Amino acid sequence: MARDRRDYYYHQAKEEGYRSRASFKLKQINEKHNVIKRGDSVVDLGAAPGGWLQVAKQLSGGKVLGVDLQRIAPIEGVETIQGDINADSTIKKIIRAVGEKGADVVLCDAAPNLSGNWSYDHARSIELTTSALECAKKILKPKGNFVVKVFQGDMFNDYLEKVRDNFVHVKAYSPQASRSQSAEIYVIGKKFLTAPLRRGDKFVVDIEKLGSGGDGAVLIEGFVVFVKEVEVGEKVRIKIADVKPNFAFADVEERLEKAEDSENLGNSEKAE
């Protein structure tokens, strides 16, 4: 506490009426990455004591919802749910609160109770942030944004890849308000993907036409995939390289027989 009293952001939070110095982290994240826009609906997971809720309400002016295992003291214009984000009952309450279309932004500044054993604490942080990501996938609108605090360590890169599998743009960012000795970092995912496929998925497809850029264009579950360096009439095994909100790019892994030799012309099948 003595260290906090000497802390610039601690004093600023007191002066400006914020419940936590962490409020300034969200302000700085938003100044840099513009994750919350005016009118956005925002859900904050692990929201107690409510510092991020206060800032989210100021930035958005729209629907703001806080979720935590603990009770959150009332904030004007903010709704709260006391519940576990891993529970289906909590997910249903969130969706009822924000609407069936989902939230524009999901935030999570939560951290596990620290034990002092760094390996254990890092693992608990990854477990918590994975729960936040899974919750976000259930409640975000297409093209929505996600911000989550993560403790750095040997599992961080794997977690970052999970976020990249679900968002078009992903950054790791450390706001100035984070203490210099802290291992925390914020992962920011923008434009949530609702495509029926993900990076690394493999399919066998027939190339029936080329797009305007000269790449092969195929439909997989109604989703357009552009395939590089193919010709009309080829049957190829592809691997998804990048996914955007409305289309994806794929590379050829193997060239198979000509499409006209296949009885399933124009079809695609998931490759194991």
Curated annotation (Swiss-Prot):
Belongs to the class I-like SAM-binding methyltransferase superfamily. RNA methyltransferase RlmE family. It comes from Methanosarcina acetivorans (strain ATCC 35395 / DSM 2834 / JCM 12185 / C2A). It holds the Pfam family TRAM. Residues 196-254 form the TRAM domain. Its main location: cytoplasm. Its EC number is 2.1.1.166. S-adenosyl-L-methionine binds at G50, W52, D68, D84, D109. This is Ribosomal RNA large subunit methyltransferase E. It catalyses: uridine(2552) in 23S rRNA + S-adenosyl-L-methionine = 2'-O-methyluridine(2552) in 23S rRNA + S-adenosyl-L-homocysteine + H(+).
